[in-house]
Amino acid sequence: MKRIAVLTSGGDAPGMNAAIRAVVRKAISEGIEVYGINHGYAGMVAGDIFPLTSASVGDKIGRGGTFLYSARYPEFAQVEGQLAGIEQLKKFGIEGVVVIGGDGSYHGAMRLTEHGFPAVGLPGTIDNDIVGTDFTIGFDTAVSTVVDALDKIRDTSSSHNRTFVVEVMGRNAGDIALNAGIAAGADDICIPEKEFKFENVVNNINKGYEKGKNHHIIVLAEGVMTGEEFATKLKEAGYKGDLRVSVLGHIQRGGSPTARDRVLASRMGARAVELLRDGIGGVAVGIRNEELVESPILGTAEEGALFSLTTEGGIKVNNPHKAGLELYRLNSALNNLNLN
């Protein structure tokens, strides 16, 4: 394989630029030319494709977002869109593609491979909801961003004896809420993977204040419901204290990636090039127990999010990823909670 391309698709995530940089520089070291595709699959179909050099990715490793831009392009789910994209790739003499994104992006990569065009997927999403990897590119940075915000919210919450509901991203997965909540010492963490009763949340809040606490922080994963809906249900369940809602929103996607995300993205990007160099497509690169692994992109894209296959201790956990179950139990123990 003498010429490959790289694109980013779906929601942006810190560390995508680091992954692109690794793809470009590793490929050049292997004697492979690299082309960038702007705006994901939309740019592929439109022919928005251009050569990348080592200088093109200089000083990009510490930048958030993606300099190749990103977009959602539902038309690529249709065969016509897929074939149009492949036709453009062939015009540029491209023989393989590295796709950086979430599960929607993986479906596109899977379709390319089914049409005989090798594609390798890299998990780029803050949600950490990709099967086949313990961690996704951007997750660590997003958690750090949320922890910083929670620390600040605690300051103002304590000053006014307030209860805060802090809504965080994650789509249908509670990984951001769970990890950031524990790291910030949140009082309650509510995630889609674990059922809870609002009456018990109210009891936890009231008990905290009775013991002398001057604030209460609830971290809410967006996959449960919106922060405003949650606040309304808390009041319906009997909570009468001062209650505010903070929605962190897209700030969680931005910012300079952490060292962990930069290293993870660099390792994955380099591995993707090695796979394409060897003529291997239709796989996604992941990390398990700090070791890089590959899994069929078909299974990765079709299996769905974490915590989806089995039920253990009331939490749906997608084996072998057990971090969610362990962390949820840890939070309950540290805060002596009973949300069930």
From Swiss-Prot:
It comes from the Bacteria. Its main location: cytoplasm. One of its GO terms (molecular function) is ATP binding. Substrate binds at residues 125-127, 162, 169-171, 222, 244, 250-253. Keywords: Allosteric enzyme, ATP-binding, Cytoplasm, Glycolysis, Kinase, Magnesium, Metal-binding, Nucleotide-binding, Transferase. Its cofactor is Mg(2+). It is found in: Cytoplasm. InterPro entries: ATP_PFK, ATP_PFK_prok-type, PFKA_ATP_prok, Phosphofructokinase_CS, Phosphofructokinase_dom, PKF_sf. The active site is at 127 (proton acceptor). The keyword Nucleotide-binding applies. Homotetramer. Catalyzes the phosphorylation of D-fructose 6-phosphate to fructose 1,6-bisphosphate by ATP, the first committing step of glycolysis. This is ATP-dependent 6-phosphofructokinase. It comes from Lactococcus lactis subsp. lactis (strain IL1403) (Streptococcus lactis).
